[in-house]
Amino acid sequence: MRRPVWFFDLDNTLHDASSHIFPYINDAMTSFVARRLHLDRDEASQVRNRYWQQYGATLLGLVKHHAVDPHDFLYETHRFDELSGSHLNDLSNIVSGEKGLRQLLNRLPGRKILLTNAPRAYAQKVLQELGIVGCFEAVEAIEDMEVHQQWRPKPDHLMIRRLLRKYRCAPHRAVLVDDTLGHLREYSKLGLKTVWFKRHVRTYTHNRSNVSLEVQSIHQLFKSWQKLK
C-alpha cells in the first residue's frame, strides 16, 4: 500500500483513556443528564447508556429528544480543569502514550489525521500532553462532524465520505486505526482499510472479519503496516 492516508482515533488508541478519563467523563455525563432532565442518578445513567446504544453517542440522543445544546454538553462533560484537589485536575497526571510515540508516528509513511468523537479542546490538550501535536496534518473532532445540520460522529457514512473528499483520498487509500470494532466494521463497508488497536480493549470478540490488521501498539503498526493491501 503506497502512501496511505491514516485516520487515527484518540482515546484508547493513542493513549489509555479507560483507567481514569472515561470513568470521569461517564460520571460527568450522568450528572449532566440528571441535572438537565431532572432525574436521579440511576435514571440518568440508564438514559445515558440507552442513547449511547441507540445512537452511538449519548450526545445525539440528548440533541434529538431534549434539544440539548451540543456545545454545552461537551464543555460540561470535559472540564478537567474544574477538578481542583483531584488527581484528574491536570491531564498531565493521567495521560501517557507508549515510549517513542512521536518518533513512530513521524516515521510512519503517509498523511495522518486525527479523527475523534471527542471535543476539539480536549483532543488538543491530550495531543499536547503526548507531545504529538505536530504529527498530524489536521484534527477532525466531533464539532467538525456536522453534515446537513446534523451531528454525525463515527461511524457515520456521510461524515467519512465528506472527509475523504476533503482530503482527496480514495477509500482504498484510507486507513482507520481505532479500538472500536463497530467503527471499523462500518467503514470497511466503504472500502477503507481497518486497523484494530486492541491494547486497551477489555472485551474481545470472535467476529473480526472486517479488520484488515490487528495491533497492540503503534510500534507494532509501524512494523507491520505494509501487510495492508
Language model features with spans:
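Short glycine/serine/threonine/alanine-rich loop segments
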Residues: L39, V68, G110, C169, ...
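N-terminal helical cap/lid subdomain that shapes the substrate entry/recognition surface
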Residues: R2-F8, T13-K99, A121
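Substrate-recognition element of Asp-dependent hydrolases with the DxDx(T/V) motif
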Residues: L74-S92, G100-L130, F136-M145
